[in-house]
Structures are given as C-alpha cells and as structure tokens.
Amino acid sequence: ANSQAKGKMETYKMDEVSPDMSFLEMMDVLNEQLMVQGIEPVAFDHDCREGICGMCSMFINGEAHGPDRLVTTCQLHMRKFKDGDTITIEPFRAEAFPVIKDLTVDRSAFDRVQQAGGFVSVNTSGNTQDANAIPIDKHDADKAFDAATCIGCGACWRRRGRRRGQRRAAACGGPRQRALIPVVLR
C-alpha cells in the first residue's frame, strides 16, 4: 500500500441510474452489475450511509466528496450529475492514506490522531448544568459549532498531497480541520 503508487483508471458504463440514488447506491448498483458479469467489484469504504462517520470519503471529479460543499459522499445524490456525464472517482491520495485497493485507503494514521485527542475544545465559559442559563458570545458559539461539525472523514488531510491549482478539501474548512493538519505535517 503506497499513496504514491500508480493506479489505473477503469471505465464503466452505467444505465438506469436514478437521480434519486445516493452516490453510494450507484456504486452498489455498479458492483452488482460487475458481479453479474463475473468482474470483481470496486472496493470502497462505507459504514453509516448517513453522513456521520466519514468512511465513504473519496474524490469525485477532483473534489473531496464531490461537487456539493459540506456534503459527504453518502449524502451526494446522482441528480447533481447530468445524464451521460463521465464521473471520475479516486481514493483519497495522501501520504497519510496509503491506498489498499481501488477506492479503499488505510485510515489508521488518522484514527490514531483522533484516539490521541485530535480535537478542538472551545471554551464557552460554562458547564453542563449552566448551559441554558449563561449567554455565550456569538463568536465563541460559532467556533464551538464549527469544531463540532467535523465528522472525521479526513478530507482535510488530502490538502498535504494536493497538486498546485487544486481546490482545498470541499467538505471542511473549520477550526478542527486547521487543528488536525499540523499533526499530519510533523
């Protein structure tokens, strides 16, 4: 497994893709078609399919999780694409995420950072029992909310290995992302 290893692109043509399908449902249909044809299915990670675990992370047309900002791959729907579009799907290719197979990457480095306390704590100057009694400054509340929205997908880690001219990870941008990136660079 090596994040710099050359892979190869495969082309698959799909018919009968409903605009209401999620991107992962489309991948499931593709894999069913491949298995019927005796072709090995495309390996990809997924878990909750509800946008809360981050396991489904992949690059779609050069963007983390695809064309929608603040949407995970499992929340992306096929209506975002036109009938007949060619969609390029790639694994997260970063030094921290060696490719295991197809779109599956080894996330263990990121998991270790999270287990070691890779999180942002925002002081909102109160404790649980005072939560509804103490007014919180809007700036502090916004910082706390931004930190809490991180689902640990790892899109922010892709920044390190990006080529010039690529846009930053589309799904993130808050303080948690900025706090985790220095951990990767050390």
Enumerate the predicted regions with their spans:
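A surface-exposed, charged beta-strand/loop segment in the N-terminal or early-internal portion
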Residues: 69-95
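A common structural microfeature
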Residues: 11, 20-23, 45, 53-55
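Extracytoplasmic/periplasmic beta-strand context in beta-sandwich domains
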Residues: 10-12, 72, 87, 173
